[in-house]
Amino acid sequence: SIPLPSLNFEQFGNMIQCTI
């Protein structure tokens, strides 16, 4: 479960926050 390289920490974090 490794996120894409340099995907966009802000967008990635937002996605995780949305899941929680």
Swiss-Prot record:
Q: Which GO terms describe its molecular function?
A: toxin activity
Task: List keywords of the entry alphabetically.
Answer: Disulfide bond, Neurotoxin, Presynaptic neurotoxin, Secreted, Toxin
User: Is Disulfide bond found in the keyword set?
Assistant: yes
The listed locations are: Secreted
Q: What cellular component terms from Gene Ontology apply here?
A: extracellular region
Q: How is it modified after translation?
A: Glycosylated.
* Tissues expressing this chain: Expressed by the venom gland.
Q: What else is known?
A: Preincubation of P-elapitoxin-Aa1a with monovalent antivenom or suramin prevents or delays toxicity, respectively. Antivenom fails to reverse neurotoxicity when applied at point of 90% neuromuscular blockade. Treatment of P-elapitoxin-Aa1a with 4-bromophenacyl bromide drastically reduces enzymatic activity and toxicity, presumably by alkylating a His residue at the active site.
Q: Which family does it belong to?
A: Belongs to the phospholipase A2 family. Group I subfamily.
Q: Give a short account of what the protein does.
A: Heterotrimer: Snake venom phospholipase A2 (PLA2) that has presynaptic neurotoxicity. Inhibits nerve-evoked twitch contractions but not responses to cholinergic agonists acetylcholine and carbachol and to depolarizing agonist KCl. Causes a fade in tetanic contractions. Displays a triphasic mode of action with depression, enhancement and blockade of neurotransmission. Does not display myotoxic activity such as changes in baseline muscle tension or inhibition of directly stimulated muscle twitches. All subunits are necessary for maximum toxicity.
Task: Share what the entry says about its subunit structure, partners included.
Answer: Heterotrimer of alpha, beta and gamma chains, each related to PLA2.
Please give the name of this protein.
Phospholipase A2 homolog P-elapitoxin-Aa1a gamma chain
